[in-house]
């Protein structure tokens, strides 16, 4: 049973997932928060501050014209007051209210930050809507537009908004002082805003010569030093905190404790980059968007280290290299990675306009910094961020100055430590099989109950889709659905999830999966690729799944076996939003369009189950696809119901035509 975040039951369950060291650390945090309420820390005096962390000559000129054009178009939309966050269009950006949630119409209350119930949507509104604007990543876009065009309108808008934000958000007051990841990303944005505005006459007056700015920067850094994410929460949040802290202590190293914070942040960054990443290079949260977020943050931090001539531990570069190679390995033919686990559209550093491919941009940066492998997919798009980061980051050395690393000679398809396997076939057939751990750390905050699920695409089109995430706070019914077992392409027993949820970011019992067979190369040679795995998430039962992709027939076979006592079964297949389905009995005819061409497939479903098509249902939710955080649209879900007696398997065959 899931408890609402912040309820007594939730606190008990959350406490049960902590170790003694984490409990002690959090107790110390609570005491410090109480002490700071009556005796807040004070920013020391700063004199002679100068900003020297500028872009090298030629970095802006290296931006491709089409990338610059997209950036300026985006900046002009922002200047006109238009922006969209998580499916909500705003037209008030010319003079924003920093505490207002346009989705619910609520305004977050003022008060001591640690007393604001930011998880309570009835009191605060949708906290993600409020926080996103104050990451100030739209300001880095405006600042980049100034750097490229020299048009001072962009710089003046940035300055006006920063002064407005600083005036409205005094240190330790309001919702923008409650979450470390927000402070860390905001600091990184400020570093880049100052860098990109360096040619503007008012830049120094806005930052280093401005006591208000100095006070804000110092308090952000002091907060992050005092309240790091700990123990079971040391996931992508702690990396954002460390990256922002490190960037600020390098670029804004004007305070008496800057050198110590820089060393501490770099040590934390190195430790947690390693801890959050499998040796194969995949992110341990097994939530692909967070792989992208962590990689962006790591590259941005590395840029600050190299620019400031601060020696980063060699393992930092090594982990980022492995992450980049892993990303290149798992994307489909259209450079789309898996839709595994939670996704909230979070970015580390934004200097590009709409239409820039996030994953192509990361691979382009990886090429510039580490060098591409022959098997990497081609990246044809351009972006603003890559030439800027590449101007700051030293190329990966080939002279033995880093730990020995052997990069894959051919494209990896099976990541044993992460339990992720990609089967590839002709005509752009791509199948991701999940036999890995249930998320990261004891709470597995961003995991879904999706053991043994498959995700299938052809030429980048979702055919058997992972439905996505949609929401975090405020809509518990939808949060439960999108992370449920029924909400994925796998088997549900007894109307229960494979793993047990204790809250919206808390799992109290984790299904354990193991891969038994992984032979992904067969289909590439014209034969058959094979994968088999099982999990023990259902007590007294074991679910085993076999997947075979045969190149010659363009056929994907999925065989599900359930060993154990007789139980009710639901087998779900979620179709992508572009797929039209005509279900007759246990056969579904699928059709869609790609680049103006008609495509089709047939899905033969197990006849032992009774099949129904569901689309856009709300009570309970079923038949939905979330293309991005805060957005959902109806899509067809095929659900077969029946019973498993442990004797026979359920066989599904997907045949692609043309």
Across the structure, where does each feature detected by a protein language model lie?
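Beta-strand-rich N-terminal accessory domains
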Residues: 14, 18, 26-30, 38, ...
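Beta-sandwich/jelly-roll carbohydrate-recognition scaffolds of carbohydrate-active enzymes
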Residues: 97, 102, 409-411, 419, ...
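Extended, charge-enriched "interface" segments that sit outside catalytic cores
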Residues: 27-121, 128-132
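Boundary detector for helix-to-coil junctions that initiate low-complexity/charged tails
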Residues: 1-27
